[in-house]
């Protein structure tokens, strides 16, 4: 996710992120371009981003420093439609979230227990429904990022019944973790503070069913890592000051294989579609990525379905001091990873680093 500074240009943001990534990434990469404000200069840059190989954009309906108005989202949709781009939106009703947080804080209710209560399922479902109504007006096919609730999925189904094209993404944390973790002692609950927050088990069940039925197209991570010590602990006296986000990019394949394939919820082919093929198709990388065929990039994973393991922060490669899946027993592991035909990882270790290249995408 490339996010410009307030007042900055998308072009400068892209240049900054390319500079950060070039020669330093061990996998191929591209970005969603965030638009945290909307003005004529930003609108004019949409076409420039397409020309630079960026076809997907992100906006926010929550977070005061990031969100835009409904009217601005509508205007952005119209510009994105002109270039056949893709828009994804963080769907939460920002006004209601702010009001709920202020209410709990003013009552002295400051522990992480109140984080999910300040962002209930209704504020996501309402925003999803509103976003999809706006998309219907703009006649734009859209993406919903990190969908977490049964009620949101119901809003998607209503939109699809109206004839809308809607893509839905969820994440492992919404499939495997639930809101009882916000009552963990010794401030451990702060490790699970993310937005949308972890939900109830009935939401997990609905999401797995949505995956099985094809209502959910992709599984990403919403990876946004903050160290527990020194960053999450900033909010030890006020949950509203805890940085929102969790690490997850490293553990996604093992978790989805363990909880999805090994437990019979989905097939291996379905897992590949959710984690690779559908993403490549949705974001204009297919058939360069997302398929094994002549002329494609030969990005391959040799998967060992029998290897077992235990997730632990002390053995992870992610640059963060904890994992929300500490102690999870896993089945299945990537034995070897090939990038454009070159072996770059084996037995959980990178053996050929910094070979990643920018993936130039063409809007289709």
Residue ranges and their predicted role:
Residues 2-6, 34, 62, 92-93, ...:
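Short, ordered loop/turn segments at secondary-structure junctions
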Residues 1-24, 41:
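Metal-associated gating/positioning segment near the N- to mid-region
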Residues 110-141, 192, 213, 217-219, ...:
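His/Asp/Glu-enriched, well-ordered alpha-helical/loop segment
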Residues 35-40:
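Active-site beta->alpha loop and helix N-cap motifs at the rims of alpha/beta catalytic domains
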Residues 41-219, 235:
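Histidine/acidic residue-rich metal-binding segments in metalloenzymes
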Residues 3-4, 171-173, 245:
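Short, acidic/turn-prone active-site loops that include or flank metal/cofactor-
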Residues 233-238, 294-359:
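C-terminal cap of metal-dependent C-N hydrolases
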């Amino acid at each position: 996710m490339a996010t410009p500074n307030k007042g900055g240009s998308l072009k400068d943001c892209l240049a900054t992120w390319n500079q950060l990534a070039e020669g330093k990434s061990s996998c191929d990469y591209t970005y969603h371009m965030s638009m945290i404000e909307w003005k004529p200069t930003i609108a004019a840059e949409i076409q420039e981003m397409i020309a630079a190989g960026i076809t997907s954009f992100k906006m926010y309906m929550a977070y005061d420093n990031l969100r835009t108005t409904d009217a601005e989202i509508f205007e952005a949709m119209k510009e994105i439609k002109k270039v056949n781009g893709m828009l994804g939106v963080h769907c939460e009703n920002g006004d209601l979230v702010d009001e709920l947080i202020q209410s709990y804080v003013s009552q002295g209710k400051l522990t992480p227990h109140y984080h999910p209560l300040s962002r209930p399922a209704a504020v996501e479902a309402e925003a999803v429904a509103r976003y999809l109504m706006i998309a219907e007006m703009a006649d734009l096919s859209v993406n919903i990022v990190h969908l977490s609730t049964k009620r949101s999925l119901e809003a998607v189904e209503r939109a699809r019944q109206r004839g809308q094209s809607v893509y839905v993404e969820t994440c492992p944390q919404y499939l495997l973790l639930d809101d009882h973790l916000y009552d963990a002692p010794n401030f451990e609950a702060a490790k699970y503070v993310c937005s949308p927050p972890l939900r109830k088990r009935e939401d997990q069940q609905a999401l797995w069913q949505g995956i099985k039925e094809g209502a959910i197209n992709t599984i990403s991570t919403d990876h946004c890592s903050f160290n527990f010590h020194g960053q999450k602990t900033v909010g030890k006296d006020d949950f509203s000051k805890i940085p929102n986000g969790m690490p997850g990019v490293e553990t996604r394949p093992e978790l989805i294989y363990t909880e999805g394939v090994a437990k019979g919820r989905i097939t291996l082919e379905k897992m590949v579609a959710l984690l690779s093929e559908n993403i490549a198709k949705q974001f204009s990388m297919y058939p360069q990525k997302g398929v094994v065929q002549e002329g494609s990039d030969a990005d391959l994973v040799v998967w060992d379905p029998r290897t077992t393991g235990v997730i632990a922060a002390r053995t992870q490669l992610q640059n963060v001091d904890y994992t929300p899946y500490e102690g999870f027993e896993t089945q299945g592991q990537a034995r070897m990873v090939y990038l454009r035909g070159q072996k770059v990882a084996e037995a959980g270790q990178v053996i050929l680093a910094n070979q990643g290249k920018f993936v130039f995408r063409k809007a289709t």
